[in-house]
Amino acid sequence: VTKVVQSMPGLSPSVGGFRNDIIIRGGAPNETVYYLDEIEIPNINHFSTQGSAGGPQGMINISFIDEVTLSTSAFGVEYDNPLSGVLQFNQRNGNTKYISGNFRFGASDSAITIEGPFSKSDNNKTTFIFSARKSYLQFLFKLIGLPIRPDYWDFQGKINHKIDEYNSLNIIG
């Protein structure tokens, strides 16, 4: 997601291009504040270095993303005190009709996502979406003889219960 955002006017990637830093109008990479469903998160990437906000691998599962909003000025009061910008990620709810899922196999990791209604007895008011992701960079690095062994597991989940037409309860983790 950050690679797409980096292509917008006034934004640039980090020098070297291997990190997911977002530099807004010349500000430092750690001056951008990230929110996931209106909860501030300090870092959205694995393997970040001091003074940066981006490592080479994102932590947020793209299967969960419903909407991304970037604000580069005139921040609302709900965003505390960002210096360069605010990047807000909104997660989607699980499928209300049936259980489904996907499996992704990438260059550095593989992931599985499962979603659906909890039960038909509550008229599909409660949905879930869960995923797990595992890197296999450590095996690739070992094969080519590199001394480092980067390794990570990601688990992400969201449960949504629709209380009425205007209210819902979300549990994320």
Feature roles, as predicted:
Residues 3, 23, 86-88, 102, ...:
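Outer-membrane beta-barrel architecture
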Residues 53, 98-100, 140-147:
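Extracellular loop and loop/strand-boundary signature of outer-membrane beta-barrel proteins
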Residues 66-67, 85-97, 133-140, 150:
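Flexible, solvent-exposed coil segments and beta strand-coil junctions
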Residues 1-76, 86-93:
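Periplasmic N-terminal accessory/gating domains of Gram-negative outer-membrane beta-barrel systems
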Residues 30-32, 64, 97-101, 122-128, ...:
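Outer-envelope beta-barrel architecture signal
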Residues 14-16, 62, 79, 104-106, ...:
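Short sequence motifs at beta-strands and strand-loop junctions characteristic
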Residues 106-136, 145-173:
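Transmembrane beta-barrel wall of Gram-negative outer-membrane proteins
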Residues 6, 19, 55, 65, ...:
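Transmembrane beta-barrel architecture of outer-membrane proteins
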